[in-house]
């Protein structure tokens, strides 16, 4: 376990991607892979902002946010995300998060990862000076 001075709660999983801020989706065999398109189900975000993390093993080395806020790479422009604070997001190409339309959320709500929380203007975050790298804050479900 790690100290509780950070943003989200994470669990370690087996994944083919370890880059914080990327969306990875369940494969159905207890592993996760980088998202390749919009509206893939069972999406998760790799975290480098977690306060607590559980489940690390020799195989499970990727911290995935399960609650709280996490920095994620946006598919649409940061300006578009600023206009849509509070809206749901889903997976996008190349491990990004994408803004869901009302119809998509009604028809495929199970594809939602969380909601848009903030679009930071700062370059680093927290006492650990975590690089933001153009990411946005998502409140994960």
Residue ranges and their predicted role:
Residues 1-141:
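Extracellular receptor-binding modules and their adjoining Ser/Thr/Gly/Asp/Asn-rich linkers
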